[in-house]
Regions:
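Active-site-proximal, structured, solvent-exposed surfaces of multi-pass membrane proteins
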Residues: 47-51, 627-868
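Membrane-embedded helix bundles of polyisoprenyl
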Residues: 19-23, 110-127, 131-213, 242-262, ...
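Membrane-interface coil-to-helix junctions
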Residues: 21-117, 139-160, 265-270, 278-293, ...
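Membrane-interface micro-motifs in multi-pass membrane enzymes
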Residues: 78-83, 102-115, 133, 140-164, ...
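Contiguous transmembrane helix-bundle modules in multi-pass membrane proteins
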Residues: 196, 319-464, 816-858, 867-868
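Periplasmic/ER-lumenal interhelical loops and adjacent helix-loop junctions
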Residues: 45, 52, 239-348, 463-470, ...
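Extracytoplasmic/lumenal acceptor-recognition loop(s) of multi-pass membrane glycoenzymes
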Residues: 79-82, 429-460, 475-545, 583, ...
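Perimembrane helix-loop-helix junctions
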Residues: 200-248, 399-409
Length: 868
């Protein structure tokens, strides 16, 4: 017995070491040296940047869940819960504030993959699957191309270790053990990725039904134990109750996150992109939800063959059928995505179940309990012929056929060949995972084969686009926090970065955001849409928007300082500049315009009205007559020479050129607008004086639909030329319009600037100060309107309303007033108490269970003593 234990322990150790080595090769080899385990796309601009901002807010407020963040004009902390509001790597960052968040996020993601592989191996062993077949299942799991998301869209897979623990916990309940492991695991899934929680619970439910149908965990792979007969029914009820209690307890503990997030999502919109408009078939013969794609389960033909083979066995038919149904019927993806779209990324939580079924099937094929069915290869071949990965899948299916022939030929003759060929069949999945993670190196070759794969380069360690953040933290600059700051250099990459010791920002990039503010940002203020989607709100050089939102400070590189701003600090290649003529964030206003009058205005007068008036629901008899400030220019006389022809003759050739103006412009706001139509549904990018607009390709995941390019710019003192940069493509430019207005009109509004005290946004404290109203008017802010604000004027509660189409304000009488504005996310208090109660009950149950074990042990000892 002891020798067997040592042999098994040695086998476990060797299997784990080989598994860790496999993961290291697959994940780290493509990264190489001098680069991060993370990509230059969303990983850098969204995930790590949002994590850093959350860390700063937690440290300043002393709270695990910051109520309000200084992004997007002011956002609920729950707007960023999609990226994992309580992720352990963010919390760890609070303990080690000097460690860069990039290092923590990358390290935690790698640790999650290693943990997923090792936990899967030991979980499969608890299912009575032998060591090397448990290793095979774990190897297939970590070879899934879905783990490409660990350095791209981290929330797609960062819950995986805890999903495996949840499945393990379900098995423990069937063994009459506590559901505590299940409860903790489900809670951690919710903390890491609430979006994937329903899909994970679906996977757990499928596994539970599978165990019920098998007669309990003991019968999972032919072991003892049964849930049959009268006693079996009682055991089923007990197991169902235990599993249900564990899940309910976990959801209750996570309610401080889930309830406010749910209300936040319901209060705003979510861009489903082109996927919402895509028609889907009743079934997907290419099984794109199962095979190859890193935005699906990402398995190979071996998994499909094992699924089809297992379907022929009674004990595995339900699990195999459920997985085939889930990955082959797009309607399942639609439901799990909350009816938003039918994207296969939501199926990734099924990967551990696929690993289980593959490991069990390979073992039974090896033992001879299941027979190879070469005819099933025809089904794999059929899927290959209609798959977008056709060349790769044909090769994969051919190798699979060779393996089957070797297995059948070695049956009863060469046991070693049969055993080792089972391990060799893992080579293709392992090599495929390596290829996907390093696809940037051979993207051209894949495209030559007709395989379209989205590749993003790994982040170079010397990347300096966020260096301003650390440099600003080392400076002692007296900012007026009743104004805002923007980063105009590399706006996309920096859109989610904000320090608590600097003014708030108007930019943000989150899949969940205030839809009213997003509409105002692009549709009302006509900020340039420079990226593939409208989710990224990255401010550019728009003088009307800067004035309205109070962008007093901007960070740029040398030579990129906008008109109207004066440099005040320099460090390295960055310049901090100031424009004190913009509006503050909060102020008293008297020049009011009714919403009805505003809605009668047309662009661009709407810009001027917002910058010179306060737009409120009703004004009574106090409204002044609005005088238009913009006038329209004739393009033929506005440009000198053939300037109009040059601009309208852009047809997709990459070029850069200058267009001279007929007369120099000084002290003006210039608006240039034209239509762009793509002839082949491709992308088009046109920059005017460094302001970039983009029409994204219709193949982009979330096309921006930006067919009207608008450029709002300050002419400065002597604008003589416009510099045009156009991208290559097949598009045409038409319907050119030009408007001008005096820049001074942006600053003519009569306002009262309050005296504000420092506040901590993470605690929900937005404004505390005094304002002296010279007459009756409105206290207007540029905090985006949403539910959750609390306003006190002279200690009395005041009801806020939407002003300036999308912001918070309220009427205020003449005189001096003390104003206090705070924010608490709807559902936060209720969720907090539910979580506190659930944690309390969970703790009591754990103590009760421990005490019960202690009492049972004591009884057994006393019983043995009496026997003696």
């Amino acid at each position: 017995m002891r020798r067997r234990f040592r042999a098994e322990s040695g086998g476990n150790g060797l299997a784990v070491l080989v598994l860790l080595a496999l993961i290291s090769v697959q994940q780290l080899l493509p990264v190489g040296t001098g680069r991060y385990f993370g990509t230059v796309g969303d990983w850098y601009s969204q995930h790590t940047a949002a994590a850093e901002t959350l860390r700063q807010a937690m440290l300043e407020s002393g709270r695990l869940i910051p109520q309000y963040l200084p992004l997007g004009g002011g956002s609920s902390g729950y707007d960023f819960a999609y990226y994992g509001l309580l992720r352990p790597d963010v919390l760890l960052g609070c303990l080690f504030p000097s460690v860069e968040m990039k290092d923590l996020v990358a390290g935690y993601a790698l640790l999650g993959i290693y943990a997923s592989g090792v936990l899967c191996f030991f979980w499969l062993k608890t299912c009575r699957i032998p060591i090397w077949f448990s290793f095979a299942g774990a190897a297939l799991l970590v070879s899934s191309s879905a783990f490409y998301q660990a350095h791209n869209q981290i929330m797609f897979v960062n819950y995986m270790p805890f999903l495996i623990l949840a499945l393990w916990g379900i098995g423990r309940v069937f063994e009459r053990k506590s559901p505590a492991l299940l409860a903790v695991a489900v809670f951690l899934i919710a903390v890491h990725s609430f979006y994937y929680l329903p899909a994970c619970l679906c996977a757990a439910g499928i596994y539970t039904i599978h165990l019920f149908l098998r007669g309990g965990k003991g019968n999972l792979c032919g072991g003892g134990g049964s849930l049959c007969g009268r006693e079996g029914k009682k055991e089923k009820l007990r197991a169902a109750a235990g599993i249900g209690a564990g899940v309910v307890m976990a959801v209750g503990m996570a309610m401080i996150l889930l309830l406010p997030v749910g209300l936040d999502i319901l209060s705003t919109g979510k861009d489903a992109g082109k996927f919402a408009e895509e028609a889907f078939t009743a079934a997907d013969p290419g099984l794109s939800g199962l095979l190859y794609s890193p935005y699906s389960c990402g398995m190979t033909a071996l998994s499909l063959y094992c699924l089809l083979t297992a379907f022929w066995q009674k004990g595995s038919r339900f699990l195999a059928g459920a997985l085939l149904l889930g990955t082959g019927v797009p309607a399942v993806s639609l439901v799990l995505n909350g009816f938003l779209y039918a994207r296969e990324k939501i199926l990734i939580p099924f990967v551990p179940l696929l690993a289980l079924l593959c490991a069990e099937t390979l073992w039974k094929l090896y033992k001879g309990e299941l027979k190879h069915r070469p005819m099933l290869l025809l089904l794999c071949l059929g899927a290959a012929l209609v798959s977008e990965w056709k060349p790769l899948m044909l090769l994969d299916t051919a190798l699979l056929g060779i393996w089957i022939l070797v297995q059948k030929g070695a049956a009863g003759r060469n046991a070693a060949l049969k055993r080792y060929s089972c391990l060799l069949c893992l080579c293709f999945p392992g090599m495929f995972a390596l290829a996907v993670n390093g696809a940037e190196f051979w993207e051209a070759q894949l495209r030559d084969l007709g395989i379209s794969i989205s590749t993003v380069s790994y982040l170079e360690q010397e990347d300096s686009r966020q260096d301003w953040y650390g440099q600003l933290g080392r400076e002692s600059i007296a900012f007026d926090r009743n104004y805002r700051m923007e980063v105009l250099t590399d706006g996309f990459v920096n859109s989610n970065l904000a320090r608590q010791d600097m003014p708030s920002r108007t930019s943000m990039y989150s899949s969940v955001s205030n839809s009213g503010y997003g509409t105002f940002f692009y549709d009302t203020m006509k900020n340039p849409i420079a990226y593939n989607n409208r989710v990224a709100l990255a401010a550019g050089e728009n003088p009307c928007f800067a004035c309205f939102m109070g962008i007093r400070y901007v960070i740029t590189k040398e030579g990129q300082v906008p008109e109207g701003y004066t440099p005040m600090e320099r460090w390295g290649e960055y310049v901090l500049s100031e424009n004190p003529r913009v509006r503050p964030v909060c102020y008293g206003a008297y020049d009011l315009m009714s919403l009805e009058s505003f809605e009668k205005l047309e662009f661009p007068e709407t810009l001027l009205a917002l910058c010179s008036r306060g737009v409120v629901r009703e004004t009574g008899d106090t409204e002044k007559l609005y005088s238009p400030g913009f006038w329209q220019e004739d393009p033929e006389t506005f440009f000198a020479g053939d300037g109009v022809e040059k601009l309208l003759s852009l047809h997709g050739k990459k070029e850069s050129f200058g267009i001279s103006l007929e007369e120099p412009l000084s002290g003006k706001v210039l608006i240039l607008q034209f239509q762009v139509e793509s002839q082949n549904k491709g992308a088009a990018v046109i920059s005017v004086n460094g302001i970039k607009n983009k029409l994204s390709s219709e193949k982009a995941p979330y096309p921006n639909g930006n067919h009207t390019f608008t450029y709002v710019m300050d002419t400065g003192d002597n604008l003589k030329e416009l510099w045009i940069e156009a991208s290559k493509g097949n598009y045409r430019v038409e319907n050119l319009k030009i408007w001008l207005a005096e820049e001074s009109l942006l600053h003519q509004e009569e306002i009262s600037i309050p005296e504000a005290e420092p506040t901590v946004w993470g605690k929900g404290e937005l404004f505390l100060g005094n304002v002296d109203m010279e007459k009756d008017g409105y206290f207007i802010t540029s905090y985006p309107w949403r539910e959750g604000y609390e306003i006190l004027a002279d200690g009395e509660a005041v009801e806020g309303e939407a002003v300036n189409t999308a912001f918070l304000g309220f009427p205020l009488d003449k005189g001096e007033h003390q104003i206090e504005i705070s924010f608490e996310a709807p559902g936060y208090t209720v969720g907090k108490w539910i979580s506190a109660g659930s944690f309390g009950i969970f703790g009591v149950l754990l103590l009760w269970g421990a005490a019960g074990k202690y009492r049972t042990a004591g009884k057994n000892i006393r019983k043995e003593e009496r026997v003696r």
